[in-house]
Amino acid sequence: GEYDILFKELEVLEAKHPELITPDSPTRRVGSEPQTGFGTIQHRLPMLSLSNAMNNDELIAFDERMKKGLGTNIDIVYISEPKIDGLGVELVYEHGTYISGSTRGDGFIGEDITQNLRTIRSLPIKLRGEVIPTLLEVRGEVFIKKDDFATLNKTQEREEKPIFANARNAAAGSLRQLDSRITASRPLSI
């Protein structure tokens, strides 16, 4: 899509002008040496599974629970989108710079997958904008698009490796690799 076109343009630009390459460029995310195991990260606020809201009353009840949990009465702005079946993650930015990422885990403590998340090209390492918060915690899903999943399984089959049962398991397994170079080779989106 559009991202892929822009990524190619960036690769061409960096090839012509290496002086423009920055350490946080998406073209530089290739993974690092294997880890010996994952550490843990405690979530500042519990990372709970979201329930479906089927009507306005359920949305209002959700808003009331969020305000109570945050200890505030101010209006909260929500962004909603269709459900994506992937692995729930939390990203932490300090002064606009990505510093850590973790799985949901048990909702209170997750696995530290900072390095593996860093390999996802669409994940911004440095936030841009005029107003950057001191601390920003972002929660979302890492997933593999349907077409990318089909291509991944064809590659697995061609290389005589086991194919993945479904895209969610492929995404989760990719993020939990001790060798982030494997993660970097997978078509993950966030």
Model-derived features: positions:
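RNA/tRNA-interacting regions in translation and RNA-turnover enzymes
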Residues: 1-190
